[in-house]
Amino acid sequence: MSRALIIGAGGVAGVVIHKCCQNSEVFTDICIASRTKSKCDKFKEELQDKTKTNITTAQVNADNVPELVALMKEYKPDICINVALPYQDLHIMDACLECKVDYVDTANYEPEDTAKFEYKWQWAYRERFEKAGITALLGSGFDPGVTGVFCAYAQKHYFDEIHTIDILDCNGGDHGYPFATNFNPEINLREVSANGSYWEDGHWVETEPMEFKSVYDFPEVGKKDMYLLHHEEIESLAKNIPGVQRIRFFMTFGQSYLTHMKCLENVGMLSTAPVEFNGQEIVPIQFLKALLPDPASLGPRTVGKTNIGCIFTGVKDGKEKSIYIYNVCDHQECYKEVESQAISYTTGVPAMIGSMMVVTGQWKKPGVFNVEEFDPDPYMEALNKWGLPWKVCEDPELVKVWKANED
């Protein structure tokens, strides 16, 4: 029915590839493309005999627009699923524009030399995508992605007005290493060492990194420390959820992770600025990435569960109301199914679902969109079908926040 070009061959890409191959009625053909073709060939070798989806592979440098254009013109995909690096989003969008190919990603663009991510660069493509008659679906991972769909679903079915949204991202997994990141180390460490922020009463409130803390008792996981971070979906939800008064994002971290991160930051290893070493320039955080375990290798050794969702407060039929919509994912179950830990799984499954929404016409219209701008119902049904079942808890525990240094 459709041809998908999947750009990337890391942990999330592996999940997208597996799920597209499970969904061969929709994805009849896929091309896996990466800078390192041998990684793509490995996926093909593993899966081709287990699926009706026809798999091809290609080498491509996602920083090189002419290379991307040449590949798209040769393969003629209906959709491009971008699970490469966020630095490469705009290059891939440029190629999609030139070749009139629909586009889906899981994380918004950020410049490689600055630890700052926001949607303005991709939203600026809206008119060009409209004129080209193609769809760009931004942020169809879990957070951003499913969390935005949860917001649209809550707005449609549970509230007349949503007043507050707290997005909670809990990883209760244990990989056994003193320090490792569950997705791209460079992206992860840049994100958590940056200033935090939240949306309140129509404007941004900025915080110091890890300044605000909470402890939350997560269903099926238990009590975890969590910290307020800046996260990209706050920006789009503030625009797309009318009347919302406050949006915050929290992520859980263990003490070992925070101690290691602070030490690395103190000695300059999280810097994005190049330094001279033995006659060549290196970027400290990129060098650190080379030393840390590859997130794709964590699957077999990670145990425990994730709990990711949104706590909403608001009004329905004149009465105050609160709910928690969430998913729980088991690391070992994910590994049994697609040889991945749950962090990659919870990002890769929604990327496939978002792409399916576009190619089947359910979420297809010209322009650049965030997930919460579409009807959430078919996406929510697909989550249950494809491995990320969700639950709704009425009157959940609400989040209480304090300054981390006041513990």
What is each model feature region?
Residues V83-P86, A95-E118:
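ADP-ribose/adenylate-binding Rossmann-like module
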Residues T36-K39:
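Helix N-cap at the beta1-alpha1 junction of Rossmann-like dinucleotide-binding domains, i.e.
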Residues N61-P77, Q88:
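Conserved Rossmann-fold cofactor-binding substructure of NAD(P)-dependent oxidoreductases
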Residues A4-G11:
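Conserved N-terminal Rossmann-fold NAD(P)-binding element of oxidoreductases
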Residues D49-N64:
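Rossmann-fold cofactor-recognition segment
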Residues A107-T135:
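Rossmann-fold NAD(P)-binding glycine/threonine-rich loop
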Residues K156-D407:
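C-terminal catalytic/substrate-binding lobe primarily of soluble NAD(P)-dependent oxidoreductases
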Residues A13-I17:
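N-terminal Rossmann-fold NAD(P) dinucleotide-binding loop
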